[in-house]
């Protein structure tokens, strides 16, 4: 997987996005009790037993999910997520009014627009119906571009900036970056997910 020219062009385009790409952090009050966040709130790891955490209406209780602290209502926003060698993960955006206490299917009808790695080898867009993704190589870093004004969400392989999938007609008024580690199943999926800050030097 190599696309240096495409990568350079994309990086130049990022500078024109307004507002500029935000530095995201994870929201501890939204994190499922099995999730451990790093001190700088940029990475998340799942543990097999829950922690004792304060009650919060923002907290996910049934699935190992966490949201970013920031939400977006207008403009374009880009961020990258390092998934490395994880065997299972899901990421994208969620609407501000998703049901966090119940186990629901992550799909646009329920306020989620995501892609996922399933069974260590299958990439899917959680559309209706699901769409199988066939990237040219394993995804280790995923780029997410949210265009609130156009109601559009696009995913890229951030290591070579190839297009993965685009959701259209997003219907929420406010969007939160969304992350789900998947259960670790011992050591197989223990690697953390990490928010990257692509324009930080």
Where on the chain are the PLM-derived regions?
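Beta-rich ligand-recognition domains in immune and ubiquitin systems
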Residues: 1-201
